[in-house]
Amino acid sequence: MIVVKVTYSVHDDYIHTNKQMIESFLKDFRKLDGTQFLYTILQSGESNTFVHISQYKNREIQDQLLKVPSFLHFQEQRDKNLATEPKIEFMNFIGSSKNQF
C-alpha cells in the first residue's frame, strides 16, 4: 500500500475556490474503482491549511488518479495560489478500524 500525506496553505481569498476545485476532482475520483484507493481531504479548522491523505493499493491506481484531468487542473490552479509550499510525506500504514483493499 502507498500512503501519501500532502499539507499546504493557500491564500485566504482562494479558500472557497480551492474547496470547489477539490469537489470537482473528487467527483471524477468517485467514478473510478473505489476499492483500489481512498482519497481524503481535511481542512485545519477554518484556516487556509489543507491536508490530503491518499491511500493507494498499488502504483498503477496511484498513476491513474494522478493523471485525472480535473486533478491536474486542481494542482495547477492551487500552485498559483499557495501561501506555503506543499509538504509531501510518505507514510507507513499501520492499521485501520476498517479493512482496506
State the predicted function of each range.
Residues 9-20:
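Short, surface-exposed ligand-recognition loops at beta-strand->loop->(often short) alpha-helix junctions
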Residues 2, 8, 36-48, 76-101:
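Glycine-rich beta-strand-turn "strand-cap" elements at beta-sheet edges
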Residues 11-13, 43-45, 57-59:
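Short coil/turn motifs at secondary-structure junctions
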Residues 24, 28-37, 55-89:
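An amphipathic, aromatic/His-enriched active-site/gating alpha helix that lines ligand/cofactor pockets
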Residues 14-16, 60-62, 96:
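Residue-level signal for secondary-structure boundary sites
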Residues 7-9, 53-55:
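Short hydrophobic/aromatic beta-strand micro-patches
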